[in-house]
Structure formats: structure tokens, C-alpha cells
Amino acid sequence: MTVKLFFNALAKFTIGVILVGLLIFLPAGTFSYFNGWLFMAILFIPMFIAGIVMMFKKPLLLSKRLSAKEKQKEQGIVVKLSGLMFIAGFVVAGLGYRFSWYSLPTGVSIGGAVAFLVAYVLYAEVLRENTYLSRTIEVQENQKVIDTGLYSVVRHPMYSVTLLLFLSMPIVLGSLYSFIILLSYPLIIAKRIKNEEELLEKELNGYREYKQKVKYRLIPFIW
């Protein structure tokens, strides 16, 4: 662990908390939005714990996860579309609470919170299995194909997990309209997967054989 990495992680975490809080509670017009606090808790408490663990046990992996500068223009567009999707989803959820648009039952939101936490556990498992993971599409020096654990089920388990994470977010927030907005995520991530696989086939030794071995990209038995 380095001092620079610590302050970089702390700064991004703090900015994330403030930004998400503003996007949810400002449109809601109040801090008495229970679903908003529930979401903030299940998002940032596990994130903080995971960050501490990675800082001491896998600082290099944490450093890669904090680096989000895409080298490819096309992937930069994908990242921007994802960002717009999140902004719209959070703002609509807040507005929905403020103006009493259709809200999901509390029990459904609690179920969404459980699904979100399960996805977080799976997210941690993917990080444990694949130390080459970064937030940008690239092939790293001495990188090897991972074909065990969740990687033996689908070729992109990180995206599978984030799909569950992101689709459970609006459910936790109790917003049907926000859920409809985040349904655009599979379309966005499908484009990213296509570009990533083209790069991996070209630059990562053994990836073609891995594709033949593991048939599904994102969802078992579907795609």
C-alpha cells in the first residue's frame, strides 16, 4: 500500500458518495427517502470494506480498478453512455419519490437489496479469481486466460455480476421507471463485450480455445 493509492481511493470513494447522494436526494427534495438510504448503505459500506481489503492484500488490483481512462474511442462512448444511464436512473428514482410516481412494494425493494448483496459477493469472487481485471479493455503483460470458477460458466462473469448489480439498483430504490432506464445496460455491455473479445482473440494467447470451451458470454444457456 502506498500513501498515493490510499488518498486516490479515499478521494474517489468520497466523491462517489457525495455524487450519488446528490443525484438521489436532490431530485427527491428530502432526506426522508428510506429507499435512498438503503441503497447508499448497501452500495458504499461493502465498497468501503472491499477497498480496505484490496488496499492491504491486492494494492495492484485496486490501482487498476481505480484507473478508468479508456484508450479506445469507441469504449469511451460506451463508458459515457453508462454514466448517462446511471444519472438518469438515479434522478428518475428521486423524482419518482418526490412526485409519488409508481413505487415498488417495500418487500420487493428488500428482495432487490438481497440480490444486490449477493451480486457484491460474486463480484468479490471474480476479483479473487482474476487479478488481471481492470476497468479498461486491455491485455496486460504476462496475462493468462482464466478458465476456472465463474469463468468456467460464462466468459465475462464480471459483466454478469454487474448486470445483476445494476438491475437490482432501481428495485432497491423502489422505482419502476428507473428500472426501465437501466434495462438499457445489457445493450450497452453487449457492445463492450464484442470489442473486448475481438481484442482478446487477437492479443491473448489461448483465448480462442477458451471461447470454444465456454460457450456463453454473459448469461448461462441464453447468451
List each model region and its residues.
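Short amphipathic alpha-helical segments enriched in hydrophobics
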Residues: T30, I45-F56
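Alpha-helical transmembrane spans of integral membrane proteins, capturing the lipid-embedded, hydrophobic core
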Residues: A9, F13-L22, M40, F44, ...
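Short, hydrophobic transmembrane alpha-helix segments
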Residues: L22-W37
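Cytosolic-biased juxtamembrane loops and peripheral soluble domains of multi-pass membrane proteins
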Residues: G51-V78, L95-W223
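Hydrophobic alpha-helical transmembrane segments of multi-pass integral membrane proteins
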Residues: L19, V79-A93
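Hydrophobic alpha-helical segments with strong N-terminal bias
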Residues: G16-L19, P27, S103, Q140
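Short, Lys/Arg-rich, polar N-terminal cytosolic tail immediately upstream
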Residues: M1-F6
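Alpha-helical transmembrane segments of multipass membrane proteins
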Residues: G21-L26, F90-V91, F166-P170
